[in-house]
């Protein structure tokens, strides 16, 4: 009996070690001068922390946003479950914002017509020279269309990474295919044209800080933004 117990303990310990070796942990935080998302202005200077776990293509992550200068800025907590195999990726995100259908901003309130949660599914493919993503809201606090019905608000985005002068660049174009007040569109509309540059600043031999700048234009709303930010991570 004692030998069996020791064998089971040894097996569990070896399994734990193996799992720890294969599980990837992400801990980071962005500081941004302006919270711009898919061409929309969602807040002023903000802290945006990330905590995630990944295992063989499967990942679970939490992402948040809190305003640092304006108390009226909406707080946000998003949970994403995704799977990547080769260039293909699929995922589901639960967005929660403090401002929504529930005036009390309760997190654990999921009633269809009084929740601050929004659920979105996505599918995409990374071709190497460019990536393509499609997102659709399927439940929760979604927008409405011209017929005052659930819009199943969707967003399509193409991103092209490239390197120039030892700096990592990404050019992005995003569009909303259907009418929805969630994105403020009356039909197909280009809502996001952005260019981001990122460069890591070396602090010590083992620590550097990625700094990024991004210019974004929203042709639909006729707005433009310039954002500066940096990322902290172990």
Question: Predicted regions span which residues?
Answer:
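Residues that define the transmembrane beta-barrel architecture of outer-membrane proteins
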Residues: 23-25, 43-47, 73-77, 115-119, ...
